[in-house]
């Protein structure tokens, strides 16, 4: 069997819990605590202030704060680094369905007129369930007269999908969220702090995927934090190593994905690539390899790539 598993589709609540259990096994944790403010001493960050689930105010002191608190990061807001501008943000809506026909072990990305520019995803989630949703730029969403929910309904009721959703039922209310894209190199560190994941705006502009870059950020942040603990240096200069390591690894791909996002806005170019892929297995493998990170995405923005497609 030459089929190789490139990844897994797993609900966030399950995967997040898996990660939390791993963390809880090696450190002290506190659940139900909401950070409200940063604590400063001598103009430097010295901890956080917040509330427990019982409503009790508490302060935790630390020589460094690592903000992994998502797209609506309180840490980034309090530092004045929160960015959710129209140009560098996408919006998405997701819903789990049961009874969707034609599911396989393959993820599906559909570039359809109802979501142009943007795409509709359909991911198998096991036990006859599917994770479906749409994503598009905040700029494009603002120009829409339709809500994201209306667009999603239009897609599943369209001629192309209506048979697959004939007996399908939503398992929840659709959930929407903002996606801070890694189209620009945002400030992610300073004296006594580092920002990771969505809090640092690391989402891939082309695919909308963020967990991979967030985990890369976690790897380098822990490396630098460990070094700082040994040296006692928690300065912006010391933490600049985190930024350098992170962007040396993901910067080129994020820049390429930004170019690809712009290219995908061209219906002519998108249809050209997809039509060639439909007729040519080699082109299919090239595109699949790029989506699964087996082939560098920068090849997709190279003129040589289109030469290959044209003559494959």
Language model feature labels by segment:
Residues 3-4, 55, 61, 190, ...:
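Alpha-helical hydrophobic/aromatic positions enriched in membrane-embedded helices and signal peptides
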Residues 3-7, 81-83, 138, 210-212:
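Short glycine-enriched, charge-decorated loop/helix-capping segments at active-site entrances
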Residues 24-28, 80, 84, 98, ...:
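Generic secondary-structure signature for well-ordered alpha-helical cores
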Residues 17, 21-167, 180, 185:
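Predominantly flavin-linked oxidoreductase catalytic cores and closely associated redox partners
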Residues 1-37, 286, 290, 297, ...:
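Conserved N-terminal/central alpha/beta ligand/cofactor-binding core
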Residues 9, 13, 87, 145-146, ...:
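Electropositive phosphate-/nucleotide-binding environments in soluble metabolic enzymes
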